[in-house]
Amino acid sequence: MRKQPTVFEKLGGQAAMHAAVPLFYKKVLADDRVKHYFKNTNMEHQAKQQEDFLTMLLGGPNHYKGKNMAEAHKGMNLQNSHFDAIIENLAATLKELGVSDQIIGEAAKVIEHTRKDCLGK
């Protein structure tokens, strides 16, 4: 029996992640709701970490070597509105890259599972 494709595969695999992350951060860094969180961030390193994390989270190969989400976001006082902004920017990025609303929804559903850890709740 053939296994169902992962969200990572449905998105287009590593090439899609590699295309999406820079565009995603362009949107995030222009978003007044969240851009201040990245003021003193090495964005090259952040983008690599994000690409690896999203790849792993969405069902691709696990090359993520960063902190867990609770530790990575500890002390940032993130609120639901901040998490929502990130999801919205990612959805807009994927839409711009031609991903269907259905697959964007599938990705958002998987990412939603990290909300509590990211918000420290």
From Swiss-Prot:
Pfam families membership: Bac_globin
Co-factor requirement: heme
Entry similarity comment: Belongs to the truncated hemoglobin family. Group I subfamily.
PROSITE patterns reported for this sequence: GLOBIN_FAM_2
The protein's name: Group 1 truncated hemoglobin
Binding partners and assembly: Monomer.
Binding site for heme: H73
Top-level taxon: Eukaryota
Cofactor binding description: Binds 1 heme group per subunit.
Keywords: Acetylation, Heme, Iron, Metal-binding, Oxygen transport, Transport
Modification N-acetylmethionine, positions: M1
A GO term, aspect molecular function: oxygen carrier activity
